[in-house]
């Protein structure tokens, strides 16, 4: 019997979807603007030719990806400015600004057809927010940036300040809700720490998602030593080799700023472990194997020795790319900025972090049967991870340690990038962004809804009959007040099921009431009842 009611409801839902298929997206003019800030590798990057002004996408692309990546993206750090500068003197890297900045952070390779979902970044969130009533260029914006650079590079911070001002003016001088993902949270926090007055002037809420506030220890350790973890799960879509990526990252301040925070009080401090072969002092040349353990500061010596003879071939020229202590010094000052940053009194902060996935925390190279004999060969070893709870990239402990007075910190089971299209995250954002009618029964911290007692569905037995009733309603949202009826309309629907040996005879009837449209909404209500012979 209940199947008949479900059939009626599905029919009405299909009718409503058909009816709304060609309508313009609903726009809510009362929403405060949102600015989306991606993490590392989360922005499309173009190379501009200085001679003819032509632009071509170098991150992300399919054809000639590795060659163009090495030619246009490889760079060297300039300690006098804190900027990493492309090796190619004839080109410079820029971020496309189409669609109010959203193009660069939406789909990272717009040309990809098969497997397109694999290069989505903020795509699902953008689509969801447009469905809530946000409008590109008026209440929805993106801030892509050159993720090779330091999170406190003044050039990037100036661009962010300009973006905040642009969003503020474009939305009619409404205060901004900033939503950052991953390393984007470090960029926002650096800006807040260094330009607190500007941040407070333009921003009302900051929501950080999966931010590595105290670093991503296991992930970055293996990235610096051989580039492995950075391309795991990405290389088949980004078409860039492990070594090409590694040689880029070794000169990226942003990577060093993601290293383990050594002065944070970790519940279990991250370590680098090496199985080493040692020569004995017995005079006969025998050796033994020992497991060595290095804390985060001690491991810097291993990085230095391991990368001491690291070189790259650039256009026929051999370039030395050792562990860069100048970048390390710069990154140390960045961590000081992050540690001292305070939340302005008028800004609210929310923290969403990923949980329930094994996340690299400490890293081990070699084993008893195959120890590391020469540190310069460490790059050829596969790492073994000692994992903790997190999102697969950022440990939960790091993501939670924002050091700010948060309105809420909420853990969501999910993967580092996948969390951006999680329905639970969407519900939290709707709540904190004040989208739609407020739900007084929804608690984002626990992510469940407490509903008052209702009698929307009733079922009872009487005189050998089973009777069930259901009531359901929908709101059709449209910004065109001319659509729909001028008065209420009432229609009826009926479905019957003949009886047989397996199923009793049953019949369901429903009344569909469509109210006239008002303020962009049209209310539809269904009342249905079914009757069957009680078997």
Curated annotation (Swiss-Prot):
Q: Which Pfam families does the protein's record reference?
A: LCAT
Q: Where is this region: Disordered?
A: 488-507
Q: Any keyword Cytoplasm? A: no
Q: Which residues carry this modification: N-acetylserine?
A: 2
- GO molecular function: any one? phospholipase activity
Give any Gene Ontology cellular component: cytosol
Query: Which protein family is named in the record?
Result: Belongs to the AB hydrolase superfamily. Lipase family.
Q: Indicate what this protein is called per its UniProt record.
A: Lecithin-cholesterol acyltransferase-like 4
User: What organism is listed for this UniProt entry?
Assistant: Arabidopsis thaliana (Mouse-ear cress)
